[in-house]
Amino acid sequence: MGCTVSTQTIGDESDPFLQNKRANDVIEQSLQLEKQRDKNEIKLLLLGAGESGKSTVLKQLKLLHQGGFSHQERLQYAQVIWADAIQSMKILIIQARKLGIQLDCDDPINNKDLFACKRILLKAKALDYINASVAGGSDFLNDYVLKYSERYETRRRVQSTGRAKAAFDEDGNISNVKSDTDRDAETVTQNEDADRNNSSRINLQDICKDLNQEGDDQMFVRKTSREIQGQNRRNLIHEDIAKAIKQLWNNDKGIKQCFARSNEFQLEGSAAYYFDNIEKFASPNYVCTDEDILKGRIKTTGITETEFNIGSSKFKVLDAGGQRSERKKWIHCFEGITAVLFVLAMSEYDQMLFEDERVNRMHESIMLFDTLLNSKWFKDTPFILFLNKIDLFEEKVKSMPIRKYFPDYQGRVGDAEAGLKYFEKIFLSLNKTNKPIYVKRTCATDTQTMKFVLSAVTDLIIQQNLKKIGII
């Protein structure tokens, strides 16, 4: 009897049908476990137009739930901020001339010291004073050229999709096909830009003849990364440049006048912070603080994932680049989203896009939010709208009327609360679904305020997720 039982057992084990069933059971069990893990994972999508403050929100999440920033990140930001500080002051000098603003530093007789500071600054090439590999390697260099070379303005437009709704279509196909009209428009734009840029370059070369022997516009990037890395000469030291920037920022009235009109051209949003703290950034061995990193900006390219745990809940935050050329990648992370965090820069109602200076940033954000909110991809997905940079908004509305850019605004000039309610109403009115939209007012660089806001938001999202999976 024992042999018979043994033979039967061996026969069962070798039965192909039984083997397939057991294999299927293992696969099914694995899928169920994975499905359960997916249910427990809260997947957030962080979206918004370029320079809205998305990445700063993510930095705050890292500070709260990931233990902050690595030593390498702190060194990287120190390099990037130093380069941006030099270029930002150069931009103010050059833009002042384009805007017809008289600079004290242009007068070598009555303002000899400031004139000398200007010469020091415009002779300095920012890339000579940083370690490009620490700053981010080729990604940093490419972004640097696109940001600071006026010759690349046309290239930024070409890389742009040209319209907010061209990020993706409802069938899931990435919209990257240009019509004949698009091509004709680009050709005309390139010709117009070429004429205008050539004219500007000639004028700038004339202006810069007193700055160096070549008469080159120092804002234009003329070196390849290989040439930069191979260059050993250091005619100026960091302290010289820092002192020049500090003197120009504190003592040249024209620089401050130009800065007050920075909505008319592209300038780093934290330029004033860089200038106010320029001496510490001048140290080649400086290690950035949390505040420095929150103020600094490194362009988001592609899609980054950040994971952290809050209690028993696992969060995954997807941060996608906000500029138009990056949006075609968004569709790859639309599936399985628990909530969308949309970041809106309130203070940029009077500014133009970096990638297309013919388009108002707030108008772009409105169109983008409308497209995402009513997309089939997010039919039942709750949205959390961050009205960001409200500190800058509250200051700006005192001198820059909202009605100048939004004629239907009826609130009092300088009334920040009325302005916030006006824009909040615009965004909420776009909702053509029954999904909830939660609005939070934020200053993403204020750690204490963001700690409170993000704690409230994560608690809300956890509750929403528990409802979704049927636990409550």
From Swiss-Prot:
The keyword S-adenosyl-L-methionine does not apply. Changing residue 50 to V: Has increased GTP occupancy and moderately reduces hydrolysis of GTP, resulting in a constitutively active form that down-regulates the pheromone response and causes hyperadaptation to pheromone. A lipid is attached at residue 2 (N-myristoyl glycine). Keywords: Cell membrane, Endosome, GTP-binding, Hydrolase, Isopeptide bond, Lipoprotein, Magnesium, Membrane, Metal-binding, Myristate, Nucleotide-binding, Palmitate, Pheromone response, Transducer, Ubl conjugation. Changing residue 297 to H: Slows hydrolysis of GTP. Residues 442-447 are annotated as: G5 motif. Residues 292-300 are annotated as: G2 motif. Residues 384-391 are annotated as: G4 motif. Residues 127-235 are annotated as: Insert. GO terms for biological process: G protein-coupled receptor signaling pathway; karyogamy involved in conjugation with cellular fusion; nuclear migration involved in conjugation with cellular fusion; pheromone-dependent signal transduction involved in conjugation with cellular fusion; regulation of carbohydrate metabolic process. Alpha subunit of the heterotrimeric guanine nucleotide-binding protein (G protein) that mediates mating pheromone signal transduction. Binding of alpha-factor or a-factor to its cognate transmembrane receptor STE2 and STE3, respectively, allows the receptor to serve as a guanine nucleotide exchange factor (GEF) on GPA1. The exchange of GDP for GTP on the G protein alpha subunit alters its interaction with the G protein beta subunit STE4, leading to dissociation of the G protein beta-gamma dimer STE4-STE18. Belongs to the G-alpha family. G(q) subfamily. Present with 9920 molecules/cell in log phase SD medium. G proteins are composed of 3 units; alpha, beta and gamma. The alpha chain contains the guanine nucleotide binding site. In its GDP-bound form, binds to the G protein beta-gamma dimer STE4-STE18. Directly interacts with the beta subunit STE4. Probably forms preactivation complexes with unligated receptors STE2 and STE3. Interacts with FUS3. Pheromone-induced activation of GPA1 increases its association with FUS3. Interacts with SCP160. SCP160 binds specifically to the GTP-bound form of GPA1. Interacts with the phosphatidylinositol 3-kinase (PI3K) subunits VPS15 and VPS34 at the endosome. This is Guanine nucleotide-binding protein alpha-1 subunit. It comes from Saccharomyces cerevisiae (strain ATCC 204508 / S288c). The lineage of its organism: Eukaryota, Fungi, Dikarya, Ascomycota, Saccharomycotina.
